[in-house]
C-alpha cells in the first residue's frame, strides 16, 4: 500500500517530462502534417483531372 503513492508520483513525473527526439533533425525531415497535405493535394489533382479525361476517352484515367 505504501508503494501506490510513489507509483502515482512517478507516473506524473514521467507524463510531464519533455519529449526528446532520439535522432537529430536533418534538412530532409518533413513534418507529418505537411506530408499529409501534399498527399491530399495530389489525390485531389488526380481525381479532378480524371473527371475531365474519362468522359470521352476510355482508358485515359490513372486507374484504368
UniProtKB/Swiss-Prot annotation:
The keyword Signal is annotated on this UniProt entry: yes
Compartmental location: Secreted
Secreted recorded as keyword: yes
Residue numbers of Tryptophan amide PTMs: 63
Record note on modification: Contains 2 disulfide bonds that can be either 'C1-C3, C2-C4' or 'C1-C4, C2-C3', since these disulfide connectivities have been observed for conotoxins with cysteine framework V (for examples, see AC P0DQQ7 and AC P81755).
Residue runs in coiled coils: none
Residues making up the propeptide: 23-48
Signal peptide bounds: 1-22
Location (main, coarse): secreted
Protein's recorded name: Conotoxin VnMRCL-04
GO MF term set: toxin activity
